[in-house]
């Protein structure tokens, strides 16, 4: 992979994703993804395993026997029981799931931090980020890959300034975390909406009309019939996205679309796990109830919890 391809992959712009003609592009910023598996307990519990431990931890489950799995699951249960009353509530389980899913964000930031804190002072300035990310590429006035790196840099600078709360163009680790992961921070959500509208609003009138909305997620392939999901999206735009029925989405309507706040996946999964494991139906789980359903939480194979336990000590 050459430098320009690498930069493209790492670009913090939300729009640069290519779609096949009949493949739907999803602009919605969901809660941190619990799993890319299908949630179908009738087939397997893969989704639940990913949600409970995080996808990366779940990958290493093949190594342990069921007995080892139960033993180490019991140790994790002790950590989930935040108030140490011997029970795991929906709220405690929800907090654990959110922690497990957000851990990858912090790991991603740690990886990026090492490459951008050039003077190793525990801060990342805009100049450091710019030099580390773009460097001499900006000296090429005519890149042959079709990407405008100067335009990408301007957009990155705007987002960096938004993440940098005190406006000194020097980011702490917390501020830097908001830079590549803006949808995790309420104060960054306006920039997410702005960038999305810039990507889709082809006529630059400050709104997203129906054709721009469809054109962003679907590229018509010659004489092929329009897929059914495209027709559904047209109906969604008219019936739900365009709330004031003026034929276009403004900033607030776009925000409601891409940053929905009416569904909490972590809470839904926590309630599901409690419902499936709560043998006496008292609305909370004992360690025994969880371990008895270890196949739901961690499967018949288990994970290398040694690393998980170390990582979760701070929880």
UniProtKB/Swiss-Prot annotation:
Binding-site residues, Ca(2+) 5: 242, 244, 246, 248, 253
Residues where Phosphotyrosine is found: 47
Domain annotation EF-hand: ranges: 68-103, 104-139, 151-186, 188-223, 229-264, 265-300
Subcellular location: Endoplasmic reticulum membrane; Golgi apparatus; Secreted; Melanosome
Phosphoserine: residues carrying this PTM: 69, 261, 277
Signal peptide: 1-19
Keyword Repeat: yes
Gene Ontology CC entries for this record: endoplasmic reticulum membrane; extracellular region; Golgi apparatus; melanosome; sarcoplasmic reticulum lumen
UniProt-listed Pfam families: EF-hand_5
Alphabetic keyword roster: Acetylation, Calcium, Endoplasmic reticulum, Glycoprotein, Golgi apparatus, Membrane, Metal-binding, Phosphoprotein, Repeat, Sarcoplasmic reticulum, Secreted, Signal
Residues involved in Ca(2+) 6 binding: 278, 280, 282, 284, 289
Residue positions binding Ca(2+) 1: 81, 83, 85, 92
Modified-residue entries (Phosphothreonine), positions: 65, 254
Assembly mode: Interacts with GGCX.
Full protein name: Calumenin
Gene name tied to this protein: CALU
